[in-house]
Every structure is written in C-alpha cells, then in structure tokens.
Swiss-Prot record:
Cofactor(s) listed: [4Fe-4S] cluster
Cofactor stoichiometry and binding remark: Binds 1 [4Fe-4S] cluster.
One cellular component (GO) term of this entry: respiratory chain complex I
Subunit structure: NDH is composed of at least 16 different subunits, 5 of which are encoded in the nucleus.
Name listed for the protein in its UniProt record: NAD(P)H-quinone oxidoreductase subunit K, chloroplastic
One Pfam assignment: Oxidored_q6
EC number(s) stated in the UniProt entry for this protein: 7.1.1.-
Keywords from the UniProt entry: 4Fe-4S, Chloroplast, Iron, Iron-sulfur, Membrane, Metal-binding, NAD, NADP, Plastid, Plastoquinone, Quinone, Thylakoid, Translocase, Transport
Subcellular location(s) of the protein: Plastid, Chloroplast thylakoid membrane
Recorded family membership: Belongs to the complex I 20 kDa subunit family.
Name of the gene: ndhK
Entry function: NDH shuttles electrons from NAD(P)H:plastoquinone, via FMN and iron-sulfur (Fe-S) centers, to quinones in the photosynthetic chain and possibly in a chloroplast respiratory chain. The immediate electron acceptor for the enzyme in this species is believed to be plastoquinone. Couples the redox reaction to proton translocation, and thus conserves the redox energy in a proton gradient.
Length: 225
C-alpha cells in the first residue's frame, strides 16, 4: 500500500466512501506508476541496474523501465554528459509526455564530476540542459540512495498541483565551449551567414550578434567559389 498521506483522501464516511479531489487522485495514480527512461553513460548506471534484482525489488514502487521516451514520465540521468550528447538528451526529454520528471544521479551528472576540471567537452551540470526535480549526489550513489530519491520524488508528486507546474520553454538551445546556454530562434531556415564560412583564429572573437544574424540565402555555387 502507498504510505504517502493525502489530506483530502484520508477523510472517509461511515460507509467507507472516500471523498477526494481529482487532483489528489491524479497525483496518487502517477506516483504509484512511474515509468523511468534510463539514460546511463557511466558507472552510476551499474548501481541503478542492481535495483532491478530481487534484493531491492524496485517493482514495489510501480517502476517499469521503458526504452521509449514517449512511454516514460521519468528520466534518470546517470553518468557524464558531453557536449556532443547534449542535443540527444534534450531531444529525449522533449519527446516525453507531460507531466515528466528528472532525477540527476551522481556527481558527474550534477556538476560534471572529475571530468569537468580540464575537459572542454563535458557539460557541467545536466540542469543546464533540462530541469531537474531531484538531485542525487554520490560517486556512485548506492541503490538505497536511489530508492530514497524516488521516495522524495513521490512525495513531491503527492503535493503537486498540475496547473502550477512550470512547463519549460521550448526552443532551440545554443551552447558554447564556456558552457553558457541560450534560447535562440530556429536556425533551420536555409539562410546562412557568409561571415561564418571563414572563422577567425579564435571562436571567442565571434560576437553573439554576428552568430545569430541572418542574411539572404547563399547558393551552393557561391559557396564553392
């Protein structure tokens, strides 16, 4: 049975009829059937895989791992996220139906870990890409800590009002080597800036106005010449 308390759901009449609200009923059904999408890239994922065994038995929480983001409402990121993998992670998150949740598992996912000290290709925190609901520190976290994070997420869902959830702004993201992310307008317009065909010696010399400035379309013949 679910041990999470609902203020309205606990009131019953003499005939054992439960009086509740649609919002509490929706929260109860969602927290009892979380379907996670496992996004594991490092050793933290091995710790999460041990939860599937009989020792921890995470099926008692209603967790059913899914391989498709369209069938999942929880994504669990475990391991290092590189700049090259960032667009794929954002695409998976945007394909998940609302409401959706994120658990960041491990130091590499939360802050970049030891790989972020001298690596230009490591994302220093997955929350720069997608909104995170629960942070789970550790290197790697134990399976008991993962269960505790899932319990905290279930408590958060129990107190949730769906209309108050802040839906993240959808748009194309631009990120640079200094790990600054920006929402920009669509770049898939077929228009290209000729000034970017011959980049300077340092990418830091390109201003933001120049990078997102659009001119008339350039034909393939002009590009060759």
């Amino acid at each position: 049975m679910n041990s999470i308390k609902f203020p309205v759901l606990d009131r019953t009449t003499k005939n054992s009829v439960i009086s509740t609200t649609l919002n509490d009923l929706s929260n109860w059904s969602r927290l009892s059937s979380l379907w996670p999408l496992l996004y594991g890239t490092s050793c933290c994922f091995i710790e999460f895989a041990s939860l599937i065994g009989s020792r921890f038995d995470f099926d008692r929480y209603g967790l059913v791992p899914r391989s498709s983001p369209r069938q999942a409402d929880l994504i669990l990121t475990a391991g290092t996220v590189t700049m090259k993998m960032a667009p794929s992670l954002v695409r998976l998150y945007e394909q998940m139906p609302e409401p959706k949740y994120v658990i960041a598992m491990g130091a590499c996912t939360i802050t970049g870990g030891m790989f972020s000290t001298d690596s230009y290709s490591t994302v220093r925190g997955v929350d720069k890409l997608i909104p995170v609901d629960v942070y789970l520190p550790g290197c790697p976290p134990k399976p008991e800590a993962v269960i505790d994070a899932i319990t905290k997420l279930r408590k958060k869902i129990a107190r949730e009002i769906y209309k108050d959830r802040i839906i993240p702004q959808r748009g194309n993201r631009c990120f640079t080597t200094n790990h600054k992310f920006f929402f920009v307008r669509s770049t898939q317009t077929g228009n290209y800036d000729q000034e970017l065909l011959y980049p300077p010696s340092s990418t830091s010399e390109i201003s933001t106005e120049t990078f997102f400035k659009y001119k008339s379309p350039v034909s393939s013949h002009e590009l060759v010449n």
